[in-house]
A protein has these predicted regions:
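Helix-rich effector regions associated with P-loop NTPase G domains
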Residues: 1-166
Length: 166
């Protein structure tokens, strides 16, 4: 992700400029929203750390089990769900509250920080094929939402017209 403008020299007289992009006002691909939050592109107040960490783990467990095993010394990563993995990470990193309860918020912060700082390694959260699939389902959900909204507006308009005037 590009945070600052960069000038990359490709040849003596040929440069590539990498500049930060602009986020669209409404994210219709839910997974992209989680990925943007995990990467730090979305402000902290716009998401819940625990939810983002669970979504991140849900993706990383099947795709990068070796990275999780190496970083958190967890055996048989693939047998974990995102929730049990977060709990195991909390126990490994000492994110325990009084009474031995797991501090999920602290564990989530650890997972997100480790991802952003590349402590888990260089990981990719989406491929072009995955994004195309997510986009198709996001566009369909958005179209369905628009149809429901339109039907609701028509219903309200009809109800207002049918209401007797005094």
């Amino acid at each position: 992700m590009t945070k600052l403008e960069q000038r990359i020299t490709l040849a003596d007289d040929f440069y590539l400029y990498d500049t930060p992009g602009v986020l669209w006002p409404r994210i219709i691909v839910e997974k992209s929203g989680y990925n943007l939050a995990a990467s730090g592109a979305i402000g902290v107040n716009a998401f819940d750390d625990e939810e983002v960490a669970l979504e991140l783990l849900h993706y990383l467990i099947p795709k990068y089990p070796q990275a999780l095993a190496l970083r958190y010394k967890i055996k048989d990563v693939s047998s974990h769900t995102d929730e049990t993995m977060l709990e195991a990470i909390a126990r490994f990193r000492g994110a325990i509250q009084s009474g031995g309860r797991v501090n999920n918020t602290k564990a989530a912060e650890i997972v997100i920080h480790d991802f952003r700082s590349a402590a888990l390694g260089r990981l990719t959260l989406e491929t072009p094929a995955e994004f195309a699939e997510w986009l198709a389902s996001g566009l369909q959900a958005d179209a369905d939402r628009a149809l429901r909204k339109e039907a609701l507006q028509k219903e309200k308009k009809t109800a207002r017209k049918a209401k007797p005037k005094n």
